[in-house]
């Protein structure tokens, strides 16, 4: 129940691409001497799962970065498909879970974003998905989602990097993939049972886009709702969010 995806092409995505290009260049020059580029920290809390459910974690802080990296992976995959690269199948493994699941329509996705971005995000990650069976029907508000803009921008810069004179350069593609996979580092902090996720969420400072009072209020309300004995866990709270808060997240004009 965090805010909508908020990263812009300028400055966040441009800076991210510069970091990745810089790391890729170092890998190409001397792979053994590359020191991972630190991208900040993320805070997670394990969600109780049962039976065939996929192990899951709630993102307390780091949602924007994790969403961005997922979009970047999808962009890499899409360019790999265009270049008929063997990496297209490999990249899909970082976006989609496989195996036996309790709720495959949800659990097959490595990342399950907030309701306002869910349809857009899944369309990027899994273009063949049946969106009507996964997310509620959303009205066309006439706005292009920032996740869509991010996807188009990242595909464009990756294409320019790996297509030389119209030909797909497998080596240049590999170095970008390696830069993302091995050359960037994020510290993952997992909360313990006695930690208060809401307090930690409010006090953490990140390098991303500042939280608004509405972002803090929304997170507080739905964290409290999750702790009030909701039957079925977050899926029922999703319905509460859709009915009472989702209209507030839509553009007013």
Locations of the language-model features?
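Covalent nucleotidyltransferase
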Residues: 1-253
């Amino acid at each position: 129940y965090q805010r909508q995806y908020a990263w812009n092409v300028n400055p966040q995505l441009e800076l991210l691409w510069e970091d990745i290009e810089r790391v890729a260049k170092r890998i190409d020059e001397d792979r053994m001497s590359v020191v991972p580029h630190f991208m900040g920290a993320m805070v997670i809390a394990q969600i109780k799962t049962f039976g065939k459910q996929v192990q899951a974690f709630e993102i307390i802080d780091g949602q924007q970065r994790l969403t961005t990296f997922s979009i970047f992976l999808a962009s890499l995959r899409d360019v790999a498909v265009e270049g008929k690269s063997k990496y297209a199948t490999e990249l899909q493994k970082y976006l989609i879970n496989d195996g036996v699941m309790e709720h495959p329509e949800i659990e097959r996705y490595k990342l399950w974003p907030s309701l306002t971005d869910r349809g857009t995000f899944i369309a990027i990650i899994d273009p063949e998905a049946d969106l009507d069976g996964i997310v509620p029907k959303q009205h066309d508000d006439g706005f292009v989602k920032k996740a869509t803009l991010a996807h188009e921008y990242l595909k464009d810069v990756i294409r320019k990097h790996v297509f030389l004179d119209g030909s797909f350069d497998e080596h240049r593609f590999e170095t970008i993939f390696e830069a993302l996979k091995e050359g960037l580092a994020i510290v993952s902090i997992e909360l313990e049972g006695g930690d208060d996720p809401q307090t930690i969420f409010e006090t953490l400072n990140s390098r991303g886009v500042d939280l608004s009072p509405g972002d803090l209020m929304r997170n507080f309300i739905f964290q409290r709702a999750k702790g009030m004995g909701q039957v079925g866990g977050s899926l029922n709270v999703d319905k509460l969010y859709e009915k009472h808060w989702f209209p507030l997240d839509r553009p007013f004009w």
